[in-house]
């Protein structure tokens, strides 16, 4: 994988979302090693960003200490942007996040992104364990975003409460969401917006429209900048890709059933694992999941870009075999995807 061709800068930017999956029969340490290997591969292929999610108390996901993992990935790469997709701000004090990301930005200048979400990223009991009180939560999200952003300002050095490491640092802040709430807030604040269409497809188009229509230019952006997150399982043949995708189906099936399991190996027939209602629920969640060979994917993903008009796509690939996962991103990077042409 050392001589992979770089993706052309003429094409639409592609980025990676990594949940750091723990594989059945493997360890958490294996998951961390695989993530660093994937990040290095993505960098060599010309991907723009490598973001890590925040999830807690989930048997198949190791991305809980997001800031720590960002440092691990940034330290093992040299050019790719590394960030959070995202930090679930209700779980944290804004000051602590400012200190963490200010530290990261000093260690890895002009390479750190800060994506912020308002969901807990876990169940209610675990959310309570994280916060320890009910005084702060999703209702405080707009105020907490603004407080966090203030810590990055140079003039905050005159404040009685400071995040010294963060002051004056260039840390792009993104708002992440799966509904119109974050879209509207991102528009009002003039921030870039990423939509979680990889698991919550229903409000993708309405949220993008709201974001663009309500966008107010800021010192950060003159015009809206949107990103959609999708699932991609690419392989050399359509048949192989659909086989590999059964690990993704099993992962989402376990989520809706409340079953705590690591990522499972692919299977020959999913009908042995789900009933009709479960299949419908999973496939609805995975509406924006693209599976197939390079030829199949180019057509389908380009159509998605034409429909959504997003400026960038971020890709999650829930693939059990690590080498197959690397190959999936290699195939994706080879596609000549371009910014969408409006459908008339």
Predicted stretch roles:
Residues 14-18, 50-52, 82-84, 112-116, ...:
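Hydrophobic faces of well-ordered beta-strands that scaffold small-molecule active sites
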Residues 9-28, 90-153, 193:
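Flexible, glycine-rich active-site loops centered on histidine and acidic residues
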Residues 18-33, 87-94, 167-177, 285-294:
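Active-site mouth loops of central-metabolism enzymes
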Residues 14, 42, 46, 54, ...:
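Conserved, mostly hydrophobic/aromatic
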Residues 183-202, 208:
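A conserved active-site cap/scaffold subdomain adjacent to cofactor or substrate pockets
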Residues 1-77, 343:
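N-terminal beta1-alpha1-beta2 module of alpha/beta enzyme domains
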Residues 29-41, 178-184, 296-303:
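Short, acidic/polar
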Residues 3-8, 134-162, 203-309, 337-343:
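An alpha-helical appendage that flanks or caps ligand/catalytic pockets
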